[in-house]
Amino acid sequence: MFVNARRYDRFLEDVHIPEPENLFSPPNGSVASRGFGSGLGLHHHAPWRLGARLGISNQLDERAYVKSCYQKYLKRYLRCVKGIDDNVKRLIDYLKETGELENTVIIYTGDQGFFLGEHDLMDKRWIYEESFRMPFIVHAPQLIQPASSNDWLINNTDFAPTILELAGLEKTPDYMQGRSFMGAFQAQPKPLNWRTSTYYRYWMHMAHSLKTPAHFGIRSERYKLIFFYGCTPEGRNQTPVAWEFYDLLKDPQEMVNEYKNPKYQSTIESLKAELDQVRGNLKETDEKYPHIQKIIAANWNQ
């Protein structure tokens, strides 16, 4: 749970925080994902109850319970973030005072995204967009047009090569997997050989009290394909196995699993081939885990 600076204990106390559109619409994804993970509602498999920690009565109906959870949860989060903002300001003020602001690149990022009620979920771990996407905000007026953005597919393995190039290194060391995306800062065209998809895996099956099933998948510029294999590396604690597929252009909130839609079958087959190739390139073939290999083989064409 978030712990804020005491000076913000009453911040936003009388404010109603707007709710995400899909707060009351858990994804119709698949039997492998429905009800799993940690969330705001009472229907999740996870024993961890946010409402209990926030002092919310479980005698409320589901909708009232979730609404109350959301308001208290978001206010705790935003109170904590308010303190972080204060310290970012302190840093910027110091750089101004020392005359180094224009000689400094400030990067604000994280190791993953985070659910704040979307899909009736909290925490991270899932391949869904709110968790999968990472914040990456850069202040460098000498390099970047303010308020600009770009659509390059970037991985966190690209962070180090980019920072090294910003520091003056001309060539990324061969032992690094990532690539510099400094060209994106300068509004250069995306290189023709830039990646068109990215891979994700969550292997800590049903770990801790958060109960997120193991899965892997691939996200292209428009589509996302996910395979829930649902077990530990040793094959224990099996949960349902299923595929999910989303058209992120038509369904950016990932509410409709189109895996069985005939319209998308050729796209799905192409993504499966790409997913298989990427897993091979990354040595993610589960050779040491034959139980997982059997699940993949049995369900690859299902």
Short names for language-model regions:
Residues H139, L248-K250:
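Inter-blade boundary loops/turns of WD-repeat beta-propellers
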Residues N261-Y264, E287-Q293:
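Mature extracytoplasmic/periplasmic domains
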Residues D9, E13, L78-V81, D85-K96, ...:
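Non-transmembrane alpha-helical segments in soluble domains
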Residues M1-I154, L166-Y175, E234-P240, P262-S266, ...:
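Active-site-proximal cap/lid insertion segments
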Residues L271, L275-H291:
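C-terminal helix-rich "cap/oligomerization" subdomain common to oxidoreductases
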Residues Q112-E118, T157-A160, E165-E244, L248, ...:
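C-terminal cap/loop subdomain of S1 sulfatases and analogous C-terminal strand-loop tails that border
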Residues D120, Y229, N257-Y259:
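Short clusters of small/polar residues that mark proteolytic maturation junctions
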